[in-house]
UniProtKB/Swiss-Prot annotation:
This is Serine incorporator 2. Non-ATP-dependent, non-specific lipid transporter for phosphatidylserine, phosphatidylcholine, and phosphatidylethanolamine. Functions as a scramblase that flips lipids in both directions across the membrane. In contrast to SERINC3 and SERINC5, has no effect on HIV-1 particles infectivity. InterPro entries: TDE1/TMS. It comes from Homo sapiens (Human). The keyword Transport does not apply. The chain crosses the membrane at residues 5-27, 40-57, 96-118, 131-150, 160-182, 202-224, 239-256, 268-290, 317-339, 385-407, 422-444. One of its GO terms (molecular function) is phospholipid scramblase activity. It is found in: Cell membrane. One of its GO terms (cellular component) is membrane. The keyword Transmembrane applies.
């Protein structure tokens, strides 16, 4: 009898791994939407790849592996297996990050193509999107193993340019998410203020708006102090001054009477969030300048703690402050992509999500939740609540962005010091300008396209 019960339990677990609902994950949680759970699991796969990349890039890991005679074969070449030995030089360092992120990007790009034009959970492909997690994990592992057998050759050089484009686009997506977050925040607090007839909510909005602007001003002052010199660093001075001017312009545009008439919820809170994010991107760009006198984050030859002996003798610019902050923002934005449900029409249009996902009435929804307690329930029978394909494309871009972040935008073959290049500087600065234009468009679009509904 015990064996029968055990077999039944294993069959139940197998059905969860191979079926259309991630019930193992949700068995200890309240009933949740299938669409949300699926996005969270895909995001977990991405975070798993990021964790492996960080481990491979960590100082000391290679030296520890070299102590195991059955693991590593001395030498620096392409990833090969010789008599059961593995070349650790190809497994660790920036090349490992490139290959790991190639595997995750290829994994999500496959699902980007597979999930094109899925309109509801009745589509057979929706079952693949929301289930078969064990097989998906095996596919990801297989792609990862295969990626380490790609010969070096021109792979890393070509993949670097894919990373540049993908990171540029993901920076824009991060800004779109911030616009959405700030808009939702402003709208909710204004609604609370009207419901409760309390000025405390207005005071809260004023406090955070002022805080974000003060932080932005402090950032400008610190960047001028540490990333410029009176007689040099002209590029940094121009970048800081231009972005400060552009942020002032969009802040003024956000409170213009005509903009307020067209979008009553537009205000300085959103502008302050965008301004602070722009200052962060500017800071990140300045920290990528490959000139010692204009960039205090560059490693020096005098025992700077950021210098790490990487695989094959490369010196790694390891975990400076902009990289850490950028990685935190990346994690938060990726989670936000998985959990978000926007009420901003223009953001939904940009992010390929629906403004009002299909909903049941209150009684039907309570019955569905009660029936599905302890597992995910299908909330997309009448229509998907987000674009499956675009979600996976965002994760492709996220994989490329984290690849560039972890490797400090290092261009293979350019130098044996893994430091950023001018390419990184210009990509980040151009992304900040494009982001400001994108935010400005969300402000003026209702004025320019009067025949469209932006309410």
């Amino acid at each position: 009898m015990g064996a029968c019960l055990g077999a039944c339990s294993l069959l139940s677990c197998a059905s969860c791994l191979c079926g259309s609902a991630p019930c193992i994950l949700c068995s200890c949680c309240p009933a949740s939407r299938n669409s949300t759970v699926s996005r969270l699991i895909f995001t977990f796969f991405l975070f798993l790849g990021v964790l492996v990349s960080i481990i491979m890039l960590s100082p000391g890991v290679e030296s520890q592996l070299y102590k195991l005679p059955w693991v590593c074969e001395e030498g620096a070449g392409i990833p090969t297996v010789l008599q059961g030995h593995i070349d650790c030089g190809s497994l660790l360092g920036y090349r490992a990050v490139y290959r790991m992120c190639f595997a995750t990007a290829a994994f999500f790009f496959f699902f980007t193509l597979l999930m094109l034009c899925v309109s509801s959970s009745r589509d057979p492909r929706a079952a693949i999107q929301n289930g078969f997690w064990f097989f998906k994990f095996l596919i990801l592992v297989g792609l990862t193993v295969g990626a380490f057998y790609i010969p070096d050759g021109s792979f890393t050089n070509i993949w670097f340019y894919f990373g540049v484009v993908g990171s540029f686009l993901f920076i824009l997506i991060q800004l779109v998410l911030l616009i959405d977050f700030a808009h939702s925040w402003n709208q909710r607090w204004l609604g609370k203020a009207e419901e409760c007839d309390s000025r405390a909510w207005y005071a809260g909005l004023f406090f955070f708006t002022l805080l974000f602007y003060l932080l932005s001003i402090a950032a400008v002052a610190l960047m001028f102090m540490y990333y410029t010199e009176p007689s040099g660093c002209h590029e940094g001075k121009v970048f800081i001054s231009l972005n400060l001017t552009f942020c002032v312009c969009v802040s003024i545009a956000a409170v213009l009477p005509k903009v307020q008439d067209a979008q009553p919820n537009s205000g300085l809170l959103q502008a302050s969030v965008i301004t602070l994010y722009t200052m962060f991107v500017t800071w990140s760009a300045l920290s990528s300048i490959p000139e010692q006198k204009c960039n205090p984050h560059l490693p020096t030859q005098l025992g700077n703690e950021t210098v790490v002996a990487g695989p094959e003798g490369y010196e790694t610019q390891w975990w400076d402050a902009p990289s850490i902050v950028g990685l935190i923002i990346f994690l938060l934005c990726t989670l936000f992509i998985s959990l978000r449900s926007s009420d901003h029409r223009q953001v939904n249009s940009l992010m390929q999500t629906e403004e009002c996902p299909p909903m049941l009435d209150a009684t039907q929804q309570q019955q569905q939740v009660a029936a599905c307690e302890g597992r995910a329930f299908d909330n997309e029978q009448d229509g998907v609540t987000y674009s499956y394909s675009f979600f996976h494309f965002c994760l492709v871009l996220a994989s490329l962005h984290v690849m560039m972040t972890l490797t400090n935008w290092y261009k293979p073959g350019e130098t044996r010091k893994m430091i950023s290049t001018w390419t990184a500087v210009w990509v980040k600065i151009c992304a900040s300008w494009a982001g400001l234009l994108l935010y400005l468009w969300t402000l003026v679009a209702p004025l320019l396209l009067r025949n469209r509904d932006f309410s």
